[in-house]
């Protein structure tokens, strides 16, 4: 059977059970449970430092109303980073390369920010559809454009899918070219493959941060 490069992004099944469900539960198993002790091991200390720094950066531009989302956004950030990093291991499946998963996260959270804005401050939320000082003849056109841009915002899930898929495809292509080459050339290609892997690690972390950062910016407009 001939396999294509995109077969690695298909969700595998075992006994009729989609393994994407198993993969989604793995990050919560890997993270250690924080304890009430003053002194912990290095992993828990590093985890607490990272969560503290990220929460400070995330809540800095938000008012008190947006601070209620701190636990949700921080958990989402850790969840996405863990899934992205685990997907870089050999013979593993990356759930965040599935558009259904990313849009399933992006659309409800974006819709929640819009509903909060319409409920708490409907005038300000609707005011975002029309920039201040717009000439009267351009008002209908700008309202249509701003409405379209509002409904395009859940495309942040597409960004996450596209970046991770492109990175995995690049590594798979480089590895496929590496196999039939002579040892001398293969050494150079191995260096390129190693650099691509480092780049993909950075992309996996950055894309998770950008996903949550954009959600916090959408929240900032509506609280």
UniProtKB/Swiss-Prot annotation:
Keywords: ATP synthesis, CF(0), Hydrogen ion transport, Ion transport, Membrane, Mitochondrion, Mitochondrion inner membrane, Transmembrane, Transmembrane helix, Transport. The keyword Iron does not apply. It is found in: Mitochondrion inner membrane. The chain crosses the membrane at residues 12-32, 69-89, 98-118, 132-152, 165-185, 197-219. One of its GO terms (molecular function) is proton channel activity. The keyword Glycoprotein does not apply. It is a multi-pass membrane protein. Its main location: mitochondrion. One of its GO terms (biological process) is proton motive force-driven ATP synthesis. One of its GO terms (cellular component) is proton-transporting ATP synthase complex. Pfam families: ATP-synt_A. It catalyses: H(+)(in) = H(+)(out). PANTHER family: ATP SYNTHASE SUBUNIT A. Belongs to the ATPase A chain family. Subunit a, of the mitochondrial membrane ATP synthase complex (F(1)F(0) ATP synthase or Complex V) that produces ATP from ADP in the presence of a proton gradient across the membrane which is generated by electron transport complexes of the respiratory chain. ATP synthase complex consist of a soluble F(1) head domain - the catalytic core - and a membrane F(1) domain - the membrane proton channel. These two domains are linked by a central stalk rotating inside the F(1) region and a stationary peripheral stalk. Component of the ATP synthase complex composed at least of ATP5F1A/subunit alpha, ATP5F1B/subunit beta, ATP5MC1/subunit c (homooctomer), MT-ATP6/subunit a, MT-ATP8/subunit 8, ATP5ME/subunit e, ATP5MF/subunit f, ATP5MG/subunit g, ATP5MK/subunit k, ATP5MJ/subunit j, ATP5F1C/subunit gamma, ATP5F1D/subunit delta, ATP5F1E/subunit epsilon, ATP5PF/subunit F6, ATP5PB/subunit b, ATP5PD/subunit d, ATP5PO/subunit OSCP. This is ATP synthase F(0) complex subunit a. The gene is mt-atp6.
